[in-house]
C-alpha cells in the first residue's frame, strides 16, 4: 500500500528537522590550542558561554565513550556502561513516557577535566545532568523507574531477566538515591556503584538555587550536539568536521573561570550561599595547590563556610559520616596520602574561623578531625610518623600533645564502614 500524501509530508518534515539539527551540530574546526573557539566565544553567546576547541571536544568524546564498570553487590554481574549509551537510553525512555528532557549536560569535576586536564584536580564521579520538569511526585518516581529499567539493557548476555525486579536492581547497583523538593530546589540524584569511587551520577534537575561553590567547579558542558552528531553522522569526527559544543560557567564569566582553573585560583560569588560541603571543597583545593585570589577576604569566606558546615551537619555523627565519605570519594587509591594533608588543613580552618559554636562543641569537632588525621597518617605506614603536624619533638612516641588532644594514639576503627552501602530510600539533602 502506498503511503498517503499526509504521511509522506509528515515524514519529510521529520527528516528535514533531523537534517537541520544535524547540520547545526557540525562546525568548522576550532583552533588546535587548548582554549575555547574564539568564533564560538563571541559576544553573541554571552560571557557565561563559550565554544569548546577541537582538543576539548576530543577529550569529551573520549570521556563519553570510555566504558565504566557498574559493580553489582552479591552475585550480580558487573555492568559495562558507556556514559553516552546510558544518556541516550535514559533520555529516550523518559520522552517515550511523556517526560520531556530539555537538555543533558556534563557537570562538575569531569567538565573541568575536559576543559583543562592539567589542573591537578582530576575527576571521580561522572555527573550527568538531565533538565526535566519535576512538578509532581509522579515525575520524581518516573525518573527512578526509568533508570532502574534501563539497567536491564546493560546486563550481560545470558543473564536471566525473568525474576529481576526494579527493587532488586536498586539493591544491586544503586549507590545513593537523593530527592530534594523545596520552594527553590527540585531535583533528584541516582548514583550507580563503582568500587573505585568513579560513580556514574544521573541528576534530574527542575530547579537548583546554586550548583557550584567556586569558579573552578562551575562548568557545565552541553552534550546534545555531540550526542546528535554520533547518532546522525556516518562520518567520524575530525578537526575539519566535528560538532559545535558549548560550555557554560555558572559562576558567570566563562573566560575568567577558565583562567582561574588554569592558574589554580580560588574565587566565588555570594559566599554566604555556599552549602556546608563547600568547606571540604575549599580545603581540597588548598591541598591541590589552589590559592584564594588576592582580592578575596579570606577570613570572611572561611567564616561563612564554617558556619554553613555546622548548620548543615550539626552533630558529630553527621560530621564524621560526611568527612569519611568525602575523603573516600576524593582521596582514594593513589591519592590516599593526601587525606592527612586535607584534614590538617581542615583543622586549621575550623580552628581559626569557627565563630558559631560553643567552645566545647568546637573542641569536639576539632578532636574528631584530629582522630581522622591520625588514622590517615597511620594508614600511610611508620615512615609517615615524622610528618605528624601536631607532634612536638620532646613528646614520647604515640602521645599527642595535651594542647591538641589528650589521649594516646591507638588503632582507630572507622565508625562507619567504608564499603559502599546501599540506600533503600531517598536521602534528605539540606
UniProtKB/Swiss-Prot annotation:
EC number: 2.7.7.19
Coiled-coil annotated residue ranges, if any: none
Bias type Low complexity, positions: 15-44
The family this protein is said to belong to: Belongs to the TENT family.
Subcellular location: Cytoplasm; Nucleus
Span list, region Disordered: 1-46
Record GO biological process: mRNA stabilization; negative regulation of apoptotic process; negative regulation of cell cycle; negative regulation of cell population proliferation; positive regulation of translation
Key words, A-Z: Cytoplasm, Nucleotidyltransferase, Nucleus, Transferase
Pfam families named among the record's database cross-references: NTP_transf_7
InterPro entries reported in the protein's UniProt record: TET5
One GO cellular component, as annotated: nucleus
Catalytic activity: RNA(n) + ATP = RNA(n)-3'-adenine ribonucleotide + diphosphate
Chief location of this protein within or outside the cell: cytoplasm
One annotated GO molecular function: poly(A) RNA polymerase activity
UniProt keyword Electron transport present: no
Protein name as it appears in the record: Terminal nucleotidyltransferase 5B
Domain of life: Eukaryota
Protein's job: Catalyzes the transfer of one adenosine molecule from an ATP to an mRNA poly(A) tail bearing a 3'-OH terminal group in an ATP hydrolysis-dependent manner. May be involved in maintaining the translation efficiency of at least some genes through preventing degradation of their mRNAs. Prefers RNA molecules that are adenosine-rich close to 3'-end. In addition, may inhibit cell proliferation and cell cycle progression through ubiquitination of beta-catenin/CTNNB1.
Organism: Bos taurus (Bovine)
